Amino acid sequence: MEQELMRIGVSLPDNLLNKFDSIIEGRGYSSRSEGIRDSIRTYINQYEWMSDIRGRRVGTITIIYDHTKRGLSNAVADIQHDYSDLIKSSVHIHLDHDNCLEVIIFDGEGELIKEMDERLMALKGVKYVKLNTAPPAEKI
């Protein structure tokens, strides 16, 4: 049985929509709506996977943020200090005049890792957050 489709409206910046349109055209989607549905499915799968992080985990959180946004660099650092027991190392590079990339390497309890990731994601001015986890070596 086919599901009923709901019509929604979304406001996006021009550059984001143009990039999205280029991607869906290149991938052969029949419509923008199909590309959006696929993107939402991917987002839901990622969120559900991330929500199920339990036990000891190792991995990285990669973030890109605008360091010119008032207080953001300090907020990123404060969050890292709040989870210093988990963080084994971090790398910070300057991508351009305004943007920085940080890779945070961690080893610890999955629920705390998820909490740290969500706090970083919620900061205004953070443009990208990617969490990658793996079980510790002894479980592989």
Swiss-Prot record:
Organism per entry: Methanococcoides burtonii (strain DSM 6242 / NBRC 107633 / OCM 468 / ACE-M)
Q: What keywords is this UniProt entry annotated with?
A: DNA-binding, Metal-binding, Nickel, Transcription, Transcription regulation
Protein name as annotated: Putative nickel-responsive regulator
Binding residue positions for Ni(2+): 81, 92, 94, 100
Note accompanying the cofactor annotation: Binds 1 nickel ion per subunit.
State the protein's purpose. Transcriptional regulator.
**Matching CDD domains:** RHH_NikR_HicB-like (cd22231)
> What GO molecular functions are on record for this protein?
DNA binding; DNA-binding transcription factor activity; nickel cation binding
